[in-house]
């Protein structure tokens, strides 16, 4: 086996010994899905990229990391992967964090385009958020479609596959 596979197996052993019940990852490319499948991972959480145009501006509020984390726990679907601590600090280092009516998002704006790294809530709110932030368009990844976004490897039989994994810094 290759060095990468050996390192992954060592990582899995360490995670099991540390009490984790599974591992989640986002392959860097489509071709890597098959490699991770050979290690026992299964694709889950289908997502699709969408473009959004502005609508009528909505009321939004900028948040700090702690506020975002608290609201994220409320917006996550049941059995969603809880990503906190260093991950949210890293996310906030490259994005601004916002809440709006029925939504929560992490986004960065480059020129006239808003790049939304995570969106939780009612997708109907997106056009208003795009307008409120002064963007001419947005790129966002939302649940749906047929292609899995992430992969999961369970270490125990008594846990079900996560329902949502949304933060990826691509």
Spans of model-derived segments:
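Conserved acetyl-CoA-binding loop-helix of GNAT-fold acetyltransferases
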Residues: 1-17, 38, 123-133
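Ordered hydrophobic segments in well-structured contexts
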Residues: 22-24, 95-98, 103-108, 115-118, ...
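Short alpha-helical
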Residues: 30-31, 124
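Active-site/acyl-donor-binding loops of N-acyltransferases
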Residues: 37-57, 117-170
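Conserved GNAT acetyl-CoA-binding A-motif
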Residues: 8, 13-28, 135-145
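Amide-forming acyltransferase catalytic core, primarily the GNAT-like/NAT-type
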Residues: 39-120, 124
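Basic (Lys/Arg-enriched) interaction patch that binds polyanionic ligands
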Residues: 26, 32-38
């Amino acid at each position: 086996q290759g060095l990468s596979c050996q390192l992954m197996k060592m990582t899995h052993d360490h995670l099991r010994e540390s009490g984790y019940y599974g591992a989640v990852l986002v392959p860097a490319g489509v071709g890597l899905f098959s490699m991770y499948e050979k290690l026992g991972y299964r694709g889950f959480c289908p997502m699709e990229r969408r473009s959004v145009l502005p609508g009528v501006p909505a009321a939004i509020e900028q948040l700090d990391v702690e506020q975002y984390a608290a609201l994220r726990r409320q917006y996550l679907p049941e059995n969603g992967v809880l990503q906190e601590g260093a991950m949210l600090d890293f996310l906030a280092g490259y994005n601004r964090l916002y809440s709006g009516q029925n939504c929560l998002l992490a986004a960065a704006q480059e020129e006239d385009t808003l790049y939304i790294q995570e969106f939780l809530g009612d997708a109907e709110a997106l056009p208003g958020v795009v307008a409120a932030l002064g963007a001419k368009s947005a790129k966002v990844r939302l649940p749906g479609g047929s292609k899995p976004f992430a992969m999961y490897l369970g270490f125990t039989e008594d846990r079900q596959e996560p329902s949502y994994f949304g933060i990826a810094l691509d």
